[in-house]
Every structure is written in structure tokens, then in C-alpha cells.
């Protein structure tokens, strides 16, 4: 996660020029706007690009990755539909990076460089209304992935609408992703109490059918922010439960991930919900989903919305069988 100032003003009009682009005047603004959310010290990426020295050292990798379209990571086709929070470079920006590298990657005048973004690695919500922290958990060495669920202690005496939600991993290198749920049944707490270690293990969800998904974090993602006038209802007395996915590890690690939430203050809020609408069990129309070896089959699923609704986001997801997927919105 990040906190930065000055980047919103870092807009530059590139004109055709004979000289080689420089880091300070041409390249830094592109990198700060599209890359350093992940590529900073302590960020999701494995190397930093926040300084000229960083970028110069990795210049050939940066050129290759941007020319191939591998970076910044953005699987949706920008030519089909423009989506919110796109990480897409223009061809002009790609060419500027390539020309900079081919020209020896000069720094230029450092006084002309844009401000370096400040990454606190803490919170995009500086003053959250609610912070919930999981108990310290010792992640054991394992040859397989671990999906561990934790019930977080919160005080929520009344219904409130979430307008911002972020997950701050306690140990970024080992946290693959985090799902955030609310549970009004108390069943998650029962499962937690039955395990002598902090939390309990469950694959696919938190083991409570009635629980509602309210947030998702993956490396490089920003805080969830709802459209203006809309919010996700957090019910009074609900338990906040997170499922943390840890990959196979060869050493003992410690994690204490937390969730920050900001509530809406408008007198009227339109309710948002995150719901699975197409799956391989309930909505499949020509199941069951069984595929014999060396067989190719096509399946269909259909969902009819029970109410008039607005779709604000879509998130295709697969655990074990999926190799690739396409979604059209």
C-alpha cells in the first residue's frame, strides 16, 4: 500500500524531440504513475524503481517488459473496453522508455525530476474509522498451500456502510491474497474456538455458508473504494473474518495482517454487495461439471438478477481447474 503526494500533478506533455529522453524529464513520471505502486522498497514487486539508480540498474528489464506488454500487469483488453484503475501505457510512453534505454539511459538534470512518491507501506486510509488486527500467527513450513481463517475483534454496534476497505499484510512476501468476510451467525468464531492455534484452516471460503464477502486483496491492489453514494453494509454485531492464503514455505514465518475500514457519512447510501452469480454448482445449466481425460466439453451457466441492479465490478476467479478465462463487460 502507499501514501503519496504530488503524483497527481505529475502530468507531462511529450513533444517530438531529437534528443534522447532523460529519466528526470521524461521517464520518471511514467514510472511513478504506472509502476512504483508495486515497484518500491517493501512493495509487492521484487525490485524497486523509485530512484534513477534503481531504474538504471533494471533498465533493460523495464524496456523488455513494457514493449512486450507484460508490464504494467493488466490482462483486460484496453481496446475492447476502458475500465476504472487501468494500468496501461500508451504507445508513446512505451517508445519513450525504449528510446531512453537505447540512448544510454541518461539521468538528466535531477532538479527537473518529479517528486519521488512516498510509500509508507502502511495505509491508504490514514484515519480509518475501524481497524481490525489478526492475532500474531506463526505460519509453519509446508509443502502445500495454506488457507487460514481468522476472526478479527471489532466493535460495530450499529449497521454502517463501508465506503473504503483495505488489507495491510503483516508479512508481504508470504501473503498470496486475502478475502474479507462478515459473519452474522457466529459460526466462524465457533470454528476458531475449536482450533488451539490462532484461526482455523478452510479452503475456498471461511466454512460458513451465510457469510458475505466484503473485500479482496491481492498484491499490487489499491484499497477498495465504492462509487459515490454507495456502500457495503456492515451489519451490527457481525464478526469480521479474513481468509489468508499462504503459499508453501520452507521456513517458519510470522504474520499479523490487518484490515482498515472507512464508513460513509451520507444520510442515504445505496447498498452494494459482492456476490457469486455464476458458479459450477447452482447456476450451471448443463452440468454436472465432470470432464473425462482427453475430453473437451462446453458448459453454460445462467443467472437472472432478482432485482434491478447496477454492476460496478466483475471478478472472474478459479482455484483448481481454470487455465485461462475471458470476461466481457
Q: Where on the chain are the PLM-derived regions?
A:
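Bacterial Sec-dependent N-terminal signal peptides
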Residues: 1-21
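Short linear sequence motifs
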Residues: 6-7, 93, 193, 210
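A generic structural signal for solvent-exposed, polar alpha-helical segments
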Residues: 9-10, 29, 58, 80, ...
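Aromatic- and Gly/Pro-enriched helix-to-coil junctions and flexible linker segments
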Residues: 16-152, 239-243
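Beta-strand-centric surfaces of beta-sandwich/beta-rich domains
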Residues: 73-74, 78-86, 112-310, 315-329
Amino acid at each position: 500500500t502507499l501514501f503519496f503526494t504530488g503524483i497527481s500533478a505529475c502530468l507531462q506533455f511529450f513533444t517530438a524531440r531529437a534528443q534522447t529522453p532523460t529519466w528526470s524529464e521524461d521517464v520518471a513520471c511514467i514510472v511513478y504513475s504506472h509502476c512504483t505502486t508495486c515497484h518500491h522498497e517493501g512493495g509487492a514487486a521484487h525490485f524497486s524503481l523509485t530512484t534513477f539508480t534503481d531504474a538504471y540498474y533494471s533498465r533493460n528489464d523495464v524496456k523488455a517488459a513494457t514493449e512486450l506488454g507484460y508490464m504494467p500487469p493488466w490482462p483486460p483488453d484496453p481496446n475492447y473496453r476502458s475500465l476504472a484503475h487501468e494500468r496501461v501505457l500508451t504507445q508513446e510512453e512505451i517508445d519513450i522508455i525504449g528510446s531512453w534505454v537505447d540512448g544510454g539511459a541518461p539521468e538528466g538534470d535531477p532538479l527537473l525530476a518529479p517528486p519521488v512518491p512516498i510509500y509508507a507501506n502502511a495505509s491508504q486510509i490514514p484515519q480509518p474509522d475501524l481497524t481490525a488486527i489478526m492475532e500474531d500467527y506463526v505460519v509453519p513450513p509446508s509443502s502445500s498451500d495454506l488457507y487460514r481463517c481468522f476472526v478479527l475483534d471489532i466493535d460495530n454496534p450499529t449497521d454502517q456502510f463501508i465506503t473504503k476497505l483495505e488489507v495491510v499484510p503483516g508479512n508481504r512476501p508470504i501473503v498470496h491474497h486475502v478475502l474479507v468476510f462478515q459473519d452474522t451467525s457466529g459460526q466462524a468464531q465457533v470454528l476458531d474456538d475449536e482450533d488451539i492455534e490462532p484461526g482455523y484452516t478452510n479452503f475456498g471460503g471461511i466454512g460458513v455458508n451465510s457469510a458475505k464477502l466484503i473485500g479482496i486483496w491481492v498484491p499490487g491492489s489499491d484499497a477498495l473504494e465504492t462509487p459515490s453514494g454507495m456502500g457495503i453494509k456492515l451489519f451490527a454485531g457481525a464478526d469480521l473474518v479474513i481468509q489468508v492464503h499462504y503459499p508453501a514455505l520452507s521456513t517458519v514465518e510470522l504474520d499479523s495482517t490487518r484490515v482498515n475500514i472507512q464508513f460513509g457519512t451520507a444520510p442515504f447510501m445505496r447498498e452494494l454487495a459482492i456476490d457469486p452469480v455464476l458458479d459450477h454448482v447452482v447456476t450451471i445449466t448443463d452440468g454436472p461439471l465432470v470432464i473425462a481425460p482427453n475430453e473437451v466439453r462446453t458448459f453454460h451457466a445462467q443467472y437472472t438478477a432478482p432485482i434491478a441492479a447496477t454492476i460496478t465490478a466483475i471478478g472472474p476467479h478459479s482455484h483448481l481447474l481454470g487455465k485461462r478465462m475471458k470476461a466481457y463487460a
